[in-house]
Amino acid sequence: PKEIIERMEDGRAVLYASEHSAAATERRAQRTWPKFATAYASVRRSEEAGIRELAETAFHVQAPLGTVDAQDRREQGWFVVRAFDHDEVDAALSEEPVTPQDIHVGDRIRLTRSQITDWRVILPEEMYGPDRSDALLAAIDRLLGLA
């Protein structure tokens, strides 16, 4: 247990969700993808530079990295969205993988919607995910001065 705690504190631990939990998160992310895309487009189109900059920093997606291991598990990586194109995003890996991979922090890849297992939007006031997609759209409206 001590080694596990130390690895978690050092950011060297990989935590695997149960298959049921991971599948539920992925379904929510897929179901709410249009709201995530709408939020991104609204921020990107803003006339205010400070808000437009959020399109480069606030939108994150999670997707599997590499291949499955001997226990049929696969590490998930978080990426910062750099560009949106319908059901695809260009994104940069935001954290170094814990398991050996051919991708590293800052590497950019194109991800399709079907590869996305979760998403997050980190606004100045708080963080939003698929379970709070309606609240995200309301927050974007407030940010843009529409509400």
Question: What are the functions of these language-model segments?
Answer:
Residues 1-147:
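Mixed-charge, low-complexity intrinsically disordered regions
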